[in-house]
Amino acid sequence: MAKAVTIKVKLVSSADTGFYYVAKKNSRTMTEKMVKKKYDPVARKHVEFREAKIK
């Protein structure tokens, strides 16, 4: 069986609220860590979310 191209990653809030999103990432084309600016409902503002491994 072939290795999956897309993997799931956890996007953790940089505001240290403990809130996170789960996103899909193409591991072949996006080799660097994913960073997105999204809404954090705990902090109630838009902050950067950085990629972390799903445990």
Curated annotation (Swiss-Prot):
Source organism, top-level taxon: Bacteria
Biological-process GO terms, alphabetical: translation
Keywords, ordered alphabetically: Ribonucleoprotein, Ribosomal protein
Cellular component terms (Gene Ontology): cytosolic large ribosomal subunit
SUPFAM superfamilies documented for this protein: Zn-binding ribosomal proteins (SSF57829)
Keyword RNA-binding: no
Example GO molecular function: structural constituent of ribosome
InterPro entries: Ribosomal_bL33, Ribosomal_bL33_sf, Ribosomal_zn-bd
HAMAP family from the UniProt entry: Ribosomal_bL33
Family: Belongs to the bacterial ribosomal protein bL33 family.
Protein name (Swiss-Prot/TrEMBL): Large ribosomal subunit protein bL33
Source organism of this protein record: Bradyrhizobium sp. (strain ORS 278)
Gene: rpmG
